[in-house]
Regions:
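C-terminal binding/interaction regions
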Residues: 1-23, 71-152
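Short acidic-glycine loop/turn motifs at beta-strand connectors
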Residues: 36-38, 113-114
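Short amphipathic alpha-helical face segments that pack within enzyme cores
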Residues: 57, 61, 92-95
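Short, well-ordered amphipathic alpha-helical segments that serve as non-catalytic structural scaffolds
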Residues: 13, 58-66
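Short beta-strand scaffold segments in enzyme catalytic cores
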Residues: 27-36
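Alpha-helix C-terminal capping segments
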Residues: 35, 65-71
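Compact, glycine-rich, soluble single-domain proteins
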Residues: 46-60
């Protein structure tokens, strides 16, 4: 867990990022701030598009920005939705974040709680996730306890 000061600072960075959001269609600004494993903070905002499926979520913009700067491990991400505090990453963003788990296997998601920052492990938002380890098991011929129903 992040200490209270670090969680509040990360959430403040996410709120600042939300101010840069391009949301002319929904008016729903979202900001995200990533804390990388080396302590760097990287932000992103949502970028809407008239072709709605091409909209980029703040979390994925922040991940892309972090990757472009050479960061690969994410310690925490704060998400700010000023119009409706307490918003969480969508399913697609949860899956993308899961791709960049640090060695300890935990990414903290910092949300705007009613009494201050609320820290939630990504695993609780994405139970039974699919990630790189699943592909490694498949490549190595391990089932990982899952049965292929087509072979029964």
């Amino acid at each position: 867990m992040l200490d209270e000061t670090a969680a509040m600072a990360l959430l403040a960075a996410a709120r600042d990022a939300a101010r840069a959001a391009y949301a002319p269609y929904s008016g729903f600004a979202v900001g995200a701030a990533i804390l990388t494993a080396d302590g760097t903070t990287v932000t992103g905002c949502n970028i809407e598009n008239a072709s709605y499926p091409l909209t980029m979520c703040a979390e994925r913009v922040a991940v892309g920005t972090a990757l472009a700067a050479g960061h690969r491990a994410i310690q925490a991400i704060a998400v700010a939705t000023p119009a409706a505090p307490g918003g969480t990453p969508c399913g697609a963003c949860r899956q993308v974040l899961n791709e960049f788990l640090p060695r300890d296997g935990t990414i903290l998601v910092v949300l705007e709680g009613s009494r201050g920052p609320e820290q939630v492990p990504l695993a609780s938002l994405l139970p039974r996730s699919f990630g790189p380890a699943d592909l490694n098991r498949a490549r190595d011929g391990e089932s990982g306890g899952r049965q292929d129903s087509s072979r029964q």
